[in-house]
Amino acid sequence: MSSAFRTVWWEAGQVCLIDQRLLPNETSVVRCTTVEEVARAIRTMQIRGAPAIGCAAAYGMALAAHHAASTATDGDHQQVYDQLAAAKTILDAQRPTAVNLSWATRRVQEKVRRLIPAAPNTLARAALEEAHAILAEDLAMCYAIGRHGVALIPPRGHVLTHCNAGGLATAGYGTALAPIRMAHEQGRPIHVYVDETRPFLQGARLTAWELLQERIPMTLITDTMAGHFMQRGAIDCVIVGADRIVANGDVANKIGTYSLAVLARAHGIPFYVAAPSSTIDLSLPNGEAIPIEERSPDEVTTCFGRRIAPEGAVAAHPAFDVTPSHLVTAIITECGVIYPPFEEPLRRVVAGSE
C-alpha cells in the first residue's frame, strides 16, 4: 500500500500543500508561512476534504506556536498559548461543516495546554509533534478503512462515488477511495463511476485524476446521470466520504450526496459511507443540528472564470447536504464496518479512538 502523493506537509517551517484548485491541469505547491495563509488556503479550497483540512489546520496551529515561541521570553508560555487560541479561532471559522477542522485544532491546543508551564520552544515542538501525529494517524486510518471496506465491494466491482474522498481529501490513500484502491491492489475487478460533482467539479478534476494516476478503470458521469446508470443495473454499490457524522448516524457530505442515497434506496443498491473516527461528532444528536456552509453563488454562475448563467440569475450554493441515517447501509471506519442502528456502534468507535 502506498500513497502516490502528499496532500499537506511541513517543510522548513512552512505548511506546504497541493493547490487543488489547479488540478488536473497543473500541479502546484502552496507554501504557507502564517496562520492567515493556511486559513485562506482552507477557505478558498486550495486544500479541501475534511481529514485533509484537519491536517492543514493542525500544521497551522504548529505554525502559530513556532511564531509565538520565536518572540517569547524563556518563561512566557502564556504568549504561545494565547497565540494558539487566536489561531484556533481563525482556523475553525473557515469551513463550519467539517468537524475534523475543530477536532484537529483542539488536539494541538490541548497537547500544549497539558505541558504548560514548559518553555515556549518546548511548547512549539509539542505542537508540531501533535500535527505530525494527526497526519500519521489519518493515513493509518485510511488504510484501515480500505481493509475493512474492501469486502463490501461486490464481485463485479462497479462502484459509484461522489465528490473526492481520495488521497487529496486526506493525508493520503483516501476514505471512500480506500476500499476501491485496495480492491485494485488485490487484483480484483473494479470499475468506478465518478460523479463530476458540480459546482466545484471535485469528481471530474480530482477523483478522476487520482484514479487515472493508478490506472484504476473509471467512467466520468454528470451528477444527473447517476439514476440512469442505477436503473440500467450498472452500479453495484455507492461509496462516499463524509464531513461530519452525528450521534444518530446522519451524514453531512458534499451537496448531492443525499440525492444519491435516495436513488440508491429506490434501486436497492447498498449505500456506504467511509469516514475515520475524527469525522464523528457525538455532540450533535441528529443532522438538523449540523451547520451547512453556504458558499458564494459565483461558484455556481461561473465555471473556470467564465460566466455560464445570464446576468441577474440568482443562485444558491449550499456546499453540503445531510443524508438521514435510515438511507445509509453501513459506515466504514478504521475500527470496522458498523450497521444501523448507529448510535451505540458510533459511541464505541469514538471511545476506541480516544
UniProtKB/Swiss-Prot annotation:
Which cysteines does the record link by disulfide bonds? Answer: none
Report whether Isomerase shows up as a keyword of the record.
yes
What SUPFAM superfamilies does UniProt report for this protein, alphabetically?
NagB/RpiA/CoA transferase-like (SSF100950)
The pathway is: Amino-acid biosynthesis; L-methionine biosynthesis via salvage pathway; L-methionine from S-methyl-5-thio-alpha-D-ribose 1-phosphate: step 1/6
Name any Gene Ontology BP term.
Answer: L-methionine salvage from methylthioadenosine
Site (Transition state stabilizer): residue numbering on this chain: C163
- What residues sit in the active site? D243 (proton donor)
Name the Gene3D superfamilies for this protein: translation initiation factor eif-2b, domain 1, Translation initiation factor eif-2b, domain 2
- Report the domain of life of the source organism: Bacteria
Any one GO MF term held by the record is:
S-methyl-5-thioribose-1-phosphate isomerase activity
Which EC main class describes this enzyme? Answer: isomerase
Q: What is its EC number?
A: 5.3.1.23
Query: What InterPro entries has UniProt attached to this entry?
Result: IF-2B-related, IF-M1Pi, IF_2B-like_C, Initiation_fac_2B_a/b/d, M1Pi_N, NagB/RpiA_transferase-like
Residues that hold substrate according to the record: R48, G49, A50, R95, Q202, N253, K254
Is Iron-sulfur a UniProt keyword of this protein? no
Keywords from the named record: Amino-acid biosynthesis, Isomerase, Methionine biosynthesis
Swiss-Prot/TrEMBL catalytic activity: 5-(methylsulfanyl)-alpha-D-ribose 1-phosphate = 5-(methylsulfanyl)-D-ribulose 1-phosphate
Q: Which NCBIfam families match?
A: eIF-2B_rel, PRK05720.1, salvage_mtnA
Q: Show the PANTHER family listed in the entry.
A: METHYLTHIORIBOSE-1-PHOSPHATE ISOMERASE
Record family assignment: Belongs to the eIF-2B alpha/beta/delta subunits family. MtnA subfamily.
According to its UniProt entry, the function of this protein is described as: Catalyzes the interconversion of methylthioribose-1-phosphate (MTR-1-P) into methylthioribulose-1-phosphate (MTRu-1-P).
Q: What is this protein called?
A: Methylthioribose-1-phosphate isomerase
